[in-house]
């Protein structure tokens, strides 16, 4: 799943609007069914936490240290949703965990502004980041209308990805006796 996410990020990075506004939503839409299958197939406590911790480690390796604790927290929230015995087989719980995981994935874009904008801005400009990128980032993530759209789009895509995943699991995997 991490490889799919990285590949989609590469595709979206050629346009600031697509990268900042659409990419997270599309990524969680595409990964929703895979995440739902992971949770349902493994069907053990800690699967979501393990996956999201690995995502955090990838971000840590790329220099975004603050995303490791974020993804561990997101993993713990998803594990709390799936905590009861048999919840990994409950489509509603799987959809809820998928939606929360996908929606909170938007934290990768929001945390730099919320936690340390001055440091992020200084580092970006000193590292040679394109000023247009930084200005667009500021436009999309500080303008309430754009932020509302981005969050609503991401939430809708995360929910849709979870529903698609749950339906695919019921239609194909459970019918075939794999799950």
Identify the function of each model-found stretch.
Residues 96-170:
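Membrane-embedded alpha-helical hairpins and interfacial helices in multi-pass inner-membrane proteins
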Residues 169-179:
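Short, charged juxtamembrane terminal tails flanking transmembrane helices
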Residues 1-50:
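Hydrophobic transmembrane alpha-helices
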Residues 27-43, 54, 58-59, 77-86:
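Generic transmembrane alpha-helix motif of multi-pass integral membrane proteins
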Residues 25-26, 48-53, 68-69, 95-99, ...:
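Hydrophobic alpha-helical transmembrane segments
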Residues 12-21, 55-84:
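Interfacial aromatic-anchored transmembrane helix boundaries in multi-pass membrane proteins
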């Amino acid at each position: 799943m991490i490889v799919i996410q990285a590949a989609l990020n590469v595709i979206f990075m050629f346009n600031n609007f697509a990268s900042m506004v659409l990419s997270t939503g599309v990524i969680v839409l595409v990964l929703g069914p895979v995440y739902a299958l992971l949770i349902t197939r493994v069907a053990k406590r800690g699967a979501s936490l393990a996956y999201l911790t690995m995502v955090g480690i990838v971000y840590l390796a790329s220099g975004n240290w603050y995303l490791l604790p974020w993804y561990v927290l997101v993993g713990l929230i998803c594990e709390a949703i799936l905590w009861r015995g048999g919840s990994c087989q409950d489509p509603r719980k799987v959809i809820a965990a998928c939606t929360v995981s996908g929606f909170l994935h938007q934290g990768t874009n929001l945390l730099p502004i919320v936690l340390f904008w001055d440091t992020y801005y200084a580092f970006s400009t000193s590292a040679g980041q394109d000023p247009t990128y930084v200005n667009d980032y500021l436009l999309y993530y500080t303008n309430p209308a754009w932020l509302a759209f981005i969050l609503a789009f991401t939430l809708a895509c995360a929910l849709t990805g979870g529903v698609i995943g749950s339906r695919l699991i019921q239609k194909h995997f459970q019918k075939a006796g794999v799950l």
